[in-house]
Amino acid sequence: LAKNADAPMSPASTTKILTAEIVFRAIVEGRLRLDDSAPISPRAASEGDAESGGSSMFAASGSQVRIDDLLRGLVVASGNDAAIALAERVAGTEEAFAALMNQRARELGMTRSHFANAWGGGGPRQSVTARDMARLAAHVIRTYPQFYPYFGQAEFTWNGVRQQNRNPLLTMAIGADGVKTGHLAQSGFGLVGSAIQNGHRLILVLNGARTEDERAREARRLLEWGFAAEGR
């Protein structure tokens, strides 16, 4: 089922799926380890602090955080600070990481997507399609079974702040196990989600919901319809 699958849309924080993929790949290739640490630069901290209004894992500027914790902060808490810290650790600068993201997107066949940063900030230079994001999600699920469970973690605590995973599907009894939500004022509430029932996996991409509740309702409705169709 597809509607406007190739129409451009803002990925918002679903961008972080690709950020995570690049980190997973670096770990698999031996260029990075989960126990390695990354510094939290002033830039990373400022994009995730309360004043910025962005999502944050609340990593302190100047601190060192393990890659394992940054990944949890990235995909569970949707931390912009985690995304920037990982980008700087892998590529040196955000700009270099964005170039790496676009190279990787092309390698994965995401031909209609373009990324400007690791955390999903708005703007015309940050654009994807639903089809491309579904392709990315399927790749991550298939290629990194050892890392995919990060996306299904229910909560994450850092600096004394406990945050729930924002994926509404995870609390529904429909077999959901990932992937990532996104939201920007100009593009609404979005979700890349996945669930598995009776050995059948479905991947869902939706965007433009007006509220969190609408996003949750539509996501559930579409997955339930999909599984019912699979069973026919």
Feature roles, as predicted:
Residues 1-131, 141:
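Active-site-adjacent loops and short helices of periplasmic peptidoglycan-processing enzymes
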Residues 62, 93-232:
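Penicillin-recognizing serine hydrolase domain
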